[in-house]
């Protein structure tokens, strides 16, 4: 059974280094618990399409629970929760409904969820691509008719397939680890290919709207939706590229940490790969978060309006984007009215002065004549 767990024993030559990395990972995960909880809390205020919010929210919720699962496994690895190798060897020979050791059941559930989440991060790019594909097809009605069934079908299908795939992975059925990782990477590459097609399709439609006479099929609202769809796809594209790069790198660590030959002959290397894999996922989530928030100026300005996001990102990027992180002073209605009419009065005075100068100049020319 391929449980995502490698205990750090007292005999490990790199024990101090491995424990240091795990403690750094736990600190980062605790920080991300609060960070992503704040994002989830504010998700209802984001002005995106319902289906897009559900798919993104589904991924964020899944990662939030994955953080809890990983911290639990880390407690087993550093010895905070005690589970000896003999108990694990006995329990792995049984079927899930015959497990009796509560600690092993907790470890198995957390490990199953971790692999399910790995499947999710490989397939979420495909979910976004399919959601944007349907937004392109039904662009004329996608905002007025929300098509909520789209997000329900996508997320429920992904959940069922992910849990089923995780169980097959743990019991080493059908495919080995390398094939499962290759399958996940294929999802990424298919989604990139689909994104390129959809991006060019939206771009050509917008160009067509601009070069031909406005007809019933290309109304102003339809062109606006096409343009918004194009902007959202261009924004998500940056995140997809980062996700694909990280998935490719982490797939190598996952294969190495579950390889039987390496487990027997190079156990220290396997533990290092396992630690790098878990720390890499924590860093990966943080990088994707920063890329999604800050990669595009339009969306950077939009997201930084929300205080939790601004608080979490300012220590890292406040000096890089100083103008975007400035908190604009909000005036009261009476103050805004006074400022508006003061500007209007100033413009009116300037216009009168310019007009008087023109009249004087005309009179001078008249008397010269």
UniProtKB/Swiss-Prot annotation:
InterPro entries: 7TM_GPCR_serpentine_rcpt_Sre. Keywords: Cell membrane, G-protein coupled receptor, Membrane, Receptor, Transducer, Transmembrane, Transmembrane helix. It is found in: Cell membrane. One of its GO terms (biological process) is sensory perception of chemical stimulus. One of its GO terms (cellular component) is plasma membrane. The chain crosses the membrane at residues 21-41, 56-76, 119-139, 149-169, 179-199, 235-255, 275-295. It comes from the Eukaryota. Residues 42-55, 140-148, 200-234, 296-369 are cytoplasmic. It is a multi-pass membrane protein. Its main location: membrane. Residues 1-20, 77-118, 170-178, 256-274 are extracellular. This is Serpentine receptor class epsilon-2. It comes from Caenorhabditis elegans.
């Amino acid at each position: 059974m391929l449980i995502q767990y490698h205990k750090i024993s007292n005999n490990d030559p790199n024990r101090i280094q491995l424990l240091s990395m795990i403690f750094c990972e736990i600190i980062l995960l605790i920080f991300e618990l609060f960070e992503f909880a704040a994002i989830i809390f504010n998700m209802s205020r984001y002005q995106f399409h319902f289906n897009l919010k559900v798919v993104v929210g589904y991924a964020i919720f899944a990662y939030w629970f994955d953080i809890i699962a990983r911290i639990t496994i880390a407690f087993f690895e550093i010895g905070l929760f005690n589970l000896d190798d003999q108990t694990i060897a006995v329990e792995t020979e049984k079927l899930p409904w015959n497990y009796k050791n509560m600690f092993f059941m907790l470890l198995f559930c957390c490990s199953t969820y971790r692999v399910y989440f790995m499947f999710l991060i490989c397939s979420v790019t495909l979910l976004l691509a399919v959601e944007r594909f349907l937004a392109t097809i039904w662009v004329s009605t996608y905002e007025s008719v929300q098509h909520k069934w789209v997000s329900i079908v996508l997320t429920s299908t992904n959940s069922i397939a992910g849990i089923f795939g995780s169980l097959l992975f743990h019991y080493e059925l059908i495919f080995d680890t390398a094939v499962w990782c290759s399958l996940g990477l294929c999802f990424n590459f298919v989604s990139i290919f689909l994104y390129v097609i959809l991006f060019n399709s939206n771009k050509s439609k917008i160009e067509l709207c601009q070069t031909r006479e406005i007809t019933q099929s290309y109304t102003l609202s339809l062109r606006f939706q096409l343009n918004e769809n194009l902007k959202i796809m261009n924004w998500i594209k940056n995140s997809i590229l980062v996700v694909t790069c990280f998935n490719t790198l982490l797939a190598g660590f996952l294969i190495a940490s579950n390889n039987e030959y390496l487990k027997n002959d190079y156990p220290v290397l396997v533990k290092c790969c396992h630690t790098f894999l878990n720390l890499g996922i924590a860093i990966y989530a943080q990088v994707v978060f920063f890329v999604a928030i800050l990669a595009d100026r339009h969306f950077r300005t939009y997201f930084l309006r929300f205080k939790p996001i601004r608080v979490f990102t300012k220590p890292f990027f406040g000096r890089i984007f100083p103008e975007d992180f400035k908190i604009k002073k909000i005036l009261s209605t009476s103050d805004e009215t006074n400022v508006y009419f003061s500007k209007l009065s100033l413009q009116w005075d300037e216009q009168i002065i310019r007009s008087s100068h023109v009249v004087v100049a005309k009179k001078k020319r008249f008397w010269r004549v």
